[in-house]
Amino acid sequence: MKNIHINARISFGEWDQELQQDVIDFVNYYISGGSLRAVADPSERVSSLIAAALEGGAARAYRQEIGGVITELRQLTELPGFSTELLEQLAAEVSRLDSGKLRALAPRTTRNNQVDAYVNGPQCLEMLLEEIAKARRYIHLSVMLFFNDDSGNRIAAALLHALDRGVQVRLMVNYTVTALGYGHNLAVGRFSEISDRLEQAGAKLQDTFHSYYSAMEWSRRRAELKAQGIPERILFLQDKVQEDVELTGLNVIDHRKFMIIDGITSIVGSLNIGDQYTFATPIEASASVQVDGRPMGVPVREEEWHDGCFRIRGAAALPLNAVFQSRWLLLGGDFYDPEDALYRSEGNTDFGSEECTLFVSFPGNPVNLMQQYYLDLITYAADETVIVNPYLIDHAFWDRLSGLGPERSCHLTICNPLEVNDHPTNRAAVRSNMYVPFCNGVSFYDYSATERFSHWKITYDHRSHAVFHGSYNINERSACHDFELGLLVKGEAFAAKVKAMIDYDLSVSRKITDKREFFKHPWMHPSTYVNTATRNYT
């Protein structure tokens, strides 16, 4: 391992870029509650150094005030309780940690990206097809569901054209869950009809349903991967999955949704591929509200869902491709190195002004950084904060929200499809838990007023001009059982555009004004117990 220091302190002047990043990663990870056992043995010394500085929560509150993540050395020096002496002592201890593992667990930040937001099927489908058509070297796509319907086949056709141009195509899809189809239509679940065509044309595919090995299988597979040169920072990720999963692994889902093209373009979202998400039917468009020249609106058909994604141009593609690589190799895919010239940008990656921080989680992770982001977002709310999410079934979220006083609650707005929802217990979870937060000042909007389902997952934090978007649901599955991925974007102009999108959704939703729509005494309602019994499952 590089930079093994034995001094009690390492002065700022001696910090190279690698050590600086390691200290930032460590502090972010530890403030969020991450266990050091995954990256240090023994870890008592470094834990004792930082524990006193974190007492009282001032450092955590400051981190949320600046957007939810520390991204530079200056912010480290401004953390309450973190003196120069403490940071220099931490540097000496952090230099002994396994930086590869630490970086796999901590958020990854890039700067000077250009980010654009898209909502509803037509916008997202058009953009996806355009970006695939531009690909010249490679396309890496990870998605939970890829349906054999109109838009699914249009995207498949675009991938086939890319293969004809000599573009490398790698896909990770959950074949088994896709096979369930939607709307009582099993035919749309026949992804094998698409995958067969793609494989015959030269694409490489992996089924993410097989994310767990038996103990014997993993022991053998781990030895094979290690012999092939796969680094420990990747292998230990599957170790954690193996330790966490019970029996069969059937309750593990790769829920991530992202794409990387040519090392320069990334797409991150909450949508899958198929007519529920990437439908081509024109929306019922607003006559007056547009963002970047694209109209806001509501899906016309009941079976079409409101959803969205971000397109990012810039350096964010590199850490995203590293995430793809780790899953790809652990699933049995062919080796590739995201640092190779083929997979990096061919030129300048400065496309804009947005700072992008990538968050990932997986079954067995020492701490779920996305869950912790949401908890801190509400705990330290001091300005307008909006959360849009389809499923509100995370007990930790509700406990934290119910414990807030009016001085925090008054800044919070939640938008959720309360009545029109594909999860049978979302309504019960909200009605059983929202009474106290509502009385304390949290605003609640029901997107069901549109008679459509919103699958969009996004937050807006006015204080730090930050937006968070990705696959993460506010439920027990995303918090504990699934592979998830999200992007925190900081930038005033971009945040304002996303806020305009959210404001449109709020304008077509129903604002709940009567506290009696929520349960003052949840224990009196049978649905409360059904929600409690099933909250760990899809």
What are these regions (language model features)?
Residues 2-538:
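Charged, low-complexity intrinsically disordered terminal segments
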